[in-house]
């Protein structure tokens, strides 16, 4: 472990020099890749440096206690310092083990969040809207930027489908466990008999793809320009600003009319399409891999039911880790930290168990 840490420190110092090299700075793709690598190593190096200071404290305290000639007060102080340093050493060793776990290369990325109303008709579409609000409020609490990309709104205010770009530090690392089927149990607003119905919405979390990672060949792309049907203000009937893009090999389609200009809609459409197409091919590769190589939280199957939101009991249950919280109102208002932290800890624990086998 310590040889690995020394190697990491050496690489971190090398990256610092490279990132100040004018030749590297002028190469945007390489500069961004090296910046990400440096950011990924930063916590490891800082924790290891702290660990070395603790080892030094332990060594100094033991040496002074072994020399003798100390009064009782000094001995007591050194013993307390030694005990505290040893406890800190154990904690730092566990922290280092977690930091050295194989890291998902997408953890530092922004995400495209896609929510669809599934089983349950209008009620499922309304629940999709509830989930969208939950993620938006959570994003705001994290200081992330939340931007609607594409929305198919139902007549009663729900969403058949909605996509959002969430940008900020560590977005994917915190929200990657949200992909799957979310089930709601409640009395719908349209229910006159007061019966509880069960509906489902599906959530898909995709790491945002940057231009240097993937560019769709123009011959594989069909672009249609048309008049926006609502968003766009006064120019909806004057200028065709809405954009529809279809990736011909996969049939993946995106439509964008949220912005007031065709160019802005085109830019957002290609960003969303790039991410969806990249995710499509990546998922094919993941499906070929052994289950052990998928995330240890759940099966990795995007149709897997991951969570139930029970309104009559004010209960949220995450089925993958057996977590039940009587805090439905709080969670749907965006206070998701307890759920997300539990998923992260569970995933890390399982990975450590695999590592120690």
Swiss-Prot record:
Record carries keyword Cytoplasm: yes
InterPro entries tied to this protein: PCRF, Pep_chain_release_fac_I, Pep_chain_release_fac_I_sf, Prokaryotic/Mito_RF, RF-1
Keyword flag Protein biosynthesis: yes
PROSITE patterns named in the record: RF_PROK_I (PS00745)
A single Gene Ontology CC term: cytoplasm
PTM comment: Methylated by PrmC. Methylation increases the termination efficiency of RF1.
Major location category of this protein: cytoplasm
Source species, domain of life: Bacteria
Positions bearing N5-methylglutamine: 234
Localisation per UniProt entry: Cytoplasm
Keywords: Cytoplasm, Methylation, Protein biosynthesis
GO terms of molecular function: translation release factor activity, codon specific
PANTHER family: LD18447P
Task performed by this protein: Peptide chain release factor 1 directs the termination of translation in response to the peptide chain termination codons UAG and UAA.
Protein family according to the UniProt entry: Belongs to the prokaryotic/mitochondrial release factor family.
Protein name per UniProt: Peptide chain release factor 1
